[in-house]
């Protein structure tokens, strides 16, 4: 079969933003103008197509990355048809995992910002994630019709707060109630959208006289930014003082793909203004899969290799999301990097080392689905029938094995106990939690060995609320939840602590004998770069002369790794520790793997107790936005919560207070802030780092355990 759309006309893009920037509304307008939806859904009505989960429609926020495909031929239908695979990502900090995994498989992103709120804390988090994957992006300043909208201020914030180099492609005509349209700086024409036709009809007009000077200056800045792309363009610009429209686009595109500049568009998605012009910008300025560097991976022998975005290359794809669909079962969302896959084909999972058959391939449109026969390089689709795939696995041709770079997911910072309300729900709850954990790598489930309780862990209170909510709605499991618990960690402060333990048991017949001598130290910065570091723990074998036979080294390491999952201090995981195995002895008859495993475990527990053990607590980066009247109360409250103020800023929404506050002090903060400020302040927080807990806090936590 011939490819329907050439790969250079593909755009795999994410729509990303801070919560409430109007991201889902922008996505809805894209679907409407591209002819996918024949009526518009509004987030506040709970009718948005991209927000398809019940919780999303109730809460008016986006939780999962909905994927959809649309076609676009330009605002005036003058361009060849382009295929957009769009992923709408959540803006709430508890769901950054969804943003992370989407960015991993996208080629470009549209960063939606609120013209009133500007750059918010979550904007910074998303921006950092996009930088990590070197994703070219452009900005859309939305909500230009809102009271307090200020395009220039937001452009300034992109520079000051995100370190970006914004290049406005448009100048707004008016703002707030007087927002009428935009000036296209390429054509130097004003664009007005017709309200009666919901923005489907538009016209070019002359620039209003009062904005000619502003538009000319903005255009000169844009042309200069384009000219800096190449020496040829710069020479032409210096000699002639101007560039042609096509040359400007080529220069801006080249610099956008190198993530040197951020083209900025503006509009009001809700008022149907500016979205189509932004889509034209996606075609002109964001990359196709062929424009991105070949994706890197490792072949069977562990050598580096690359996948070129071409149908003629062997098949390779990355599974970036697993989802349970009530009608077809488990769905595996994947991005094809090279080659072609037909439904019914066999694929090789190079992470699990297993072959699997793809039953059906579905093109997803939010939660609706169309069955398709094949996918090609650059496509994003969902497969039915894959049983053992998890997020981040590579699917490839079994004759050309490759493992693409895996995704790294954050460790949960909050836990709570959960138990079914009835005996009959016990089994159902286990199955439901297993399914949800398979879908969401930042959500963990474990059973507490002592109490037998089921403990769920995640990225924040909202994250776990929604998990419990989904259990009830999707799996009919009613559950009681305990109070949130902080995910503390344990470590040591003393270096080179020696611990010698001999495990000997003689009870007639074959005995048990294992003897190890270890040295325990905190990991240094150099240690952290060591290739053998696994999960913030480093084991180094320094045994010489066969004092412990080789076959017992692995059980020793295993014994240590099992012990650090529940630290000797208070049962929390141990982090940042290096253990050297320096000496030991064995018995020809009585030594066994189990004996050495036990000896290693006991040696570690004894050594840990002597190495000045300390408890670490998670510290959250908190940003509070409030009217000035309440600053004194808020700062006093931050200090009472053991917070450290990091500084203050002015924003379009009020005063911004930045602070580092222990997570243990933040439970119920939303309610407290609301009552302190009559509901006029907002806050956002994200995990920043672990820090040693003060002695009184550590003592309280240890006593409780």
From Swiss-Prot:
Q: Which Pfam families match?
A: EFG_C, EFG_III, EFG_IV, GTP_EFTU, GTP_EFTU_D2
| One cellular component (GO) term of this entry | cytoplasm
Q: What is its main location?
A: cytoplasm
UniProt record, GO biological process: ribosome disassembly
- GO MF annotation terms: GTP binding; GTPase activity; guanosine tetraphosphate binding; translation elongation factor activity
Localization, per the record, is: Cytoplasm
- What are the record keywords, sorted? Cytoplasm, Elongation factor, GTP-binding, Nucleotide-binding, Protein biosynthesis
Q: Which residues form the tr-type G domain?
A: 8-290
**Entry-linked InterPro entries:** EFG_II (IPR041095), EFG_III (IPR009022), EFG_III/V (IPR035647), EFG_IV (IPR047872), EFG_V (IPR035649), EFG_V-like (IPR000640), EFTu-like_2 (IPR004161), G_TR_CS (IPR031157)
Q: Which residues bind GTP?
A: 17-24, 88-92, 142-145
Can the keyword Translocase be found in this entry's annotation?
no
Give the family, as the similarity comment puts it.
Belongs to the TRAFAC class translation factor GTPase superfamily. Classic translation factor GTPase family. EF-G/EF-2 subfamily.
HAMAP family cross-referenced by the UniProt entry: EF_G_EF_2_B
Query: What exactly does this protein do?
Result: Catalyzes the GTP-dependent ribosomal translocation step during translation elongation. During this step, the ribosome changes from the pre-translocational (PRE) to the post-translocational (POST) state as the newly formed A-site-bound peptidyl-tRNA and P-site-bound deacylated tRNA move to the P and E sites, respectively. Catalyzes the coordinated movement of the two tRNA molecules, the mRNA and conformational changes in the ribosome.
Q: Which NCBIfam families does the record cross-reference, listed alphabetically?
A: EF-G (TIGR00484), PRK12740.1-5 (NF009381), small_GTP (TIGR00231)
Protein name (database record): Elongation factor G
What organism, scientifically named, is this protein from?
Xylella fastidiosa (strain Temecula1 / ATCC 700964)
């Amino acid at each position: 079969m011939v490819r329907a759309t050439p790969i250079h006309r593909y755009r795999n893009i994410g729509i990303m933003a801070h919560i409430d920037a109007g991201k889902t509304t922008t996505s809805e307008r894209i679907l409407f103008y591209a002819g996918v939806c024949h009526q518009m859904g509004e987030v506040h009505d709970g009718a948005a197509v991209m927000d398809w989960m019940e919780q999303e429609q109730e809460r008016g926020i986006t939780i999962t990355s909905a994927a959809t495909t649309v076609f676009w031929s330009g605002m005036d239908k003058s361009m060849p048809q382009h295929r957009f695979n769009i992923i709408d990502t959540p803006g709430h900090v508890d769901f950054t995992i969804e943003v992370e995994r989407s960015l991993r498989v996208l080629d470009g992103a549209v960063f939606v910002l609120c013209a009133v709120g500007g750059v918010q804390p979550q904007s910074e988090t998303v921006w950092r994630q996009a930088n990590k994957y070197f994703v070219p992006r452009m900005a859309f300043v939305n909500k230009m019709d809102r009271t307090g909208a200020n395009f220039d201020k937001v452009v300034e914030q992109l520079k000051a707060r995100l370190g970006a180099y914004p290049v406005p492609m448009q100048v707004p005509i008016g703002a707030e109630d007087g927002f009428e349209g935009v000036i296209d700086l390429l054509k130097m024409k004003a664009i007005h959208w017709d309200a009666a036709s919901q923005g489907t009809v538009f016209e070019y007009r002359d620039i209003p006289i009062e904005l000619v000077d502003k538009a000319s200056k903005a255009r000169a800045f844009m042309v200069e930014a384009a000219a800096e792309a190449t020496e040829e363009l710069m020479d032409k610009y210096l000699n002639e003082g101007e560039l042609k429209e096509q040359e400007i686009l080529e220069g801006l595109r080249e610099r956008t793909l190198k993530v040197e500049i951020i083209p900025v568009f503006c509009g009001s998605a809700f008022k149907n203004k500016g979205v189509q012009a932004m889509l034209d910008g996606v075609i002109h300025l964001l990359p196709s899969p062929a424009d991105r560097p070949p994706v890197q991976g490792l072949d069977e022998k562990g050598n580096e290799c690359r996948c070129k975005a071409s149908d003629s290359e062997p098949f390779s794809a990355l599974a970036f999301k697993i989802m349970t669909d009530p009608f077809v079962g488990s769905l595996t969302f994947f991005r094809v990097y090279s080659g072609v896959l037909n439904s019914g084909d066999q694929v090789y999972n190079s992470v699990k080392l297993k072959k699997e058959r793809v039953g059906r391939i579905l093109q997803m449109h939010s939660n609706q689905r169309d069955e398709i026969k094949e996918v090609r390089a650059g496509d994003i689709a969902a497969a039915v029938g894959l049983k053992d795939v998890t997020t981040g696995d590579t699917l490839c041709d079994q004759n050309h094995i490759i493992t693409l770079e895996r995704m790294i997911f954050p460790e949960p910072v909050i836990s709570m106990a959960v138990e079914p309300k009835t005996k009959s729900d016990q089994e159902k709850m286990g199955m439901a939690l297993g399914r949800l954990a398979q879908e969401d790598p930042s959500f963990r489930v474990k059973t507490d060995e002592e109490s037998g309780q089921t403990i769920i862990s995640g990225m924040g209170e909202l994250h776990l609320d929604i998990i419990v909510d989904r259990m009830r709605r999707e799996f009919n499991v009613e559950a009681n939840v305990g109070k949130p618990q902080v995910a503390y960690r344990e470590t040591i402060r003393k270096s080179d602590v020696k611990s010698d333990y001999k495990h000997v048991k003689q009870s007639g017949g074959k005995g048990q004998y294992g003897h190890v001598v270890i040295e325990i130290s905190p990991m240094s910065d150099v240690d952290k770069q060591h290739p053998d570091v696994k999960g913030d723990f480093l084991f180094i074998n320094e045994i010489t002369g066969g004092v412990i036979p080789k076959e017992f080294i692995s059980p020793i390491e295993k014994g240590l790794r099992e012990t650090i999952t529940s630290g000797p201090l208070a049962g929390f995981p141990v982090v940042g520790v290096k253990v050297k195995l320096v000496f030991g002895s064995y018995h020809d008859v009585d030594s066994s793997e189990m004996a050495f495993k036990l000896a290693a475990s006991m040696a570690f527990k004894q050594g840990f107790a002597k190495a000045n053990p300390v408890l670490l607590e998670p510290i959250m980066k908190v940003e509070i936005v409030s009217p000035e009247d309440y600053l004194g109360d808020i700062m006093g409250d931050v200090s009472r919560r053991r917070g450290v103020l990091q500084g203050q800023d002015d924003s379009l929404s009020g005063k911004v207070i930045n602070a580092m506050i222990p997570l243990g002090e933040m439970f119920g903060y939303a309610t407290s802030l609301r009552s302190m400020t009559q509901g006029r302040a907002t806050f956002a927080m994200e995990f920043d780092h672990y820090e040693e807990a003060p002695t009184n806090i550590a003592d309280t936590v240890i006593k409780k355990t």
